[in-house]
């Protein structure tokens, strides 16, 4: 049997742009993608901490070092520039793989710079 587990997370990213007229997706600074192992075209879930909205889309790599987190297309209706979001990717794996899997979590500051890298989420922690 296969299980779907969190693979990577960008925690507390700030929305830098919302572009309604783009085809779709989320544009994310490629340095952030590399740090947690996310890839172009990968399906992600985005949770908006400001309004509770949840959506699924796919990744487009953004300019390195820019800190860009831009929601494109219809998803732009669910965010405002400055909103705090959580971007999560998932992976399917066997139960054996799941037993040793360690997700990569990047905790970001208000400029979308990595403040801390976590190998797992500690229980009952507020970040």
UniProtKB/Swiss-Prot annotation:
Q: Per the record, GO CC terms?
A: cytosol
Chief place where the protein resides = cytoplasm
Q: Which GO terms describe its molecular function?
A: aspartate 1-decarboxylase activity
Location within or outside the cell: Cytoplasm
* Annotated S-S bridges: none
* Cofactor: binding comment: Binds 1 pyruvoyl group covalently per subunit.
Q: Which GO terms describe its biological process?
A: alanine biosynthetic process; pantothenate biosynthetic process
Keywords (A to Z) from UniProt: Autocatalytic cleavage, Cytoplasm, Decarboxylase, Lyase, Pantothenate biosynthesis, Pyruvate, Schiff base, Zymogen
The UniProt entry, under HAMAP family, shows: PanD
Complex formation: Heterooctamer of four alpha and four beta subunits.
**Summary of the function given for this chain in its UniProt record:** Catalyzes the pyruvoyl-dependent decarboxylation of aspartate to produce beta-alanine.
Q: What name is this protein filed under?
A: Aspartate 1-decarboxylase
Q: Encoded by which gene?
A: panD
């Amino acid at each position: 049997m296969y299980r779907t587990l969190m693979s990577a997370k960008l925690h507390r990213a700030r929305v830098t742009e919302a572009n309604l007229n783009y085809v779709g997706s989320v544009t994310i600074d490629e340095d952030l993608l590399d740090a947690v192992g996310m890839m172009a075209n990968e399906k992600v879930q985005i949770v908006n901490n400001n309004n509770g909205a949840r959506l699924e889309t796919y990744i487009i790599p953004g300019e390195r070092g820019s800190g860009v987190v831009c929601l494109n297309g219809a998803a732009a209706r669910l965010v405002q520039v400055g909103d705090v979001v959580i971007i999560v990717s998932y992976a399917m794996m066997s139960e054996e793989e799941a037993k040793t899997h360690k997700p990569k979590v990047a905790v970001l500051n208000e400029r979308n710079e990595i403040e801390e890298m976590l190998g797992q989420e500690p229980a009952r922690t507020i970040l």
